[in-house]
Amino acid sequence: MRPFAELSQLIFPSRCFGCHRLGPSICSACRSSWHPHYYKTKVDSLTVHSALLYTPTASKIILAAKESGLKGADDLLIEAIIHVLDKSIPDTTLFRLVPIPSSKASQRRRGRSFVVDLVSQISQRTGIPMIDCLQLSRRVLDQSGLHRDERASNLAGAFTLISPARGELILIDDVVTTGATLREAARALNSQGFQAIGSVTAITACVAQRLR
């Protein structure tokens, strides 16, 4: 899907991901709901730092990146995550980015492990190393149609560690909703003696404190 998406962007004019008007990937009208700030919330003891609140515009950008593989949408998410990393990490030399992996079925459908691909690009841009150390060890359902308790049950015990994860670990995901994914990823690290000191996402659907 990825090569086709990149070819289509060469053939068809660019449109705003929010309202589909011809022009830049995010137009001035939609920019008001896609303007990275710095939000903080908690998932158990894990502090989650995010750039944006979940809005209809944010939803469209996630879908354009995740399901359509559009580079312009990828770039918006990457820039949002880098914005928060710049705000929340004083010394990048100590930290390692741990991406949340996609399921095997999602990887086959999309042609990539979505967040792993984003974090690889973030690592190249920032110089912060990535450790791709997590994998889903069993089949899980698509989280989008599940409620809070169903999400937690769906992911319980689903992540395993496939390589050591040393350093100051930061979990990276595109969006935090109920926190079930980040909670399970942190559990998998903790079970092998490693610890995530925090998490960064582009978008939060949780009640979050805006810091700046």
Residue spans of the language-model regions?
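Glycine-rich phosphate/pyrophosphate-handling loop used in enzymes and phosphotransfer proteins
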Residues: 1-212
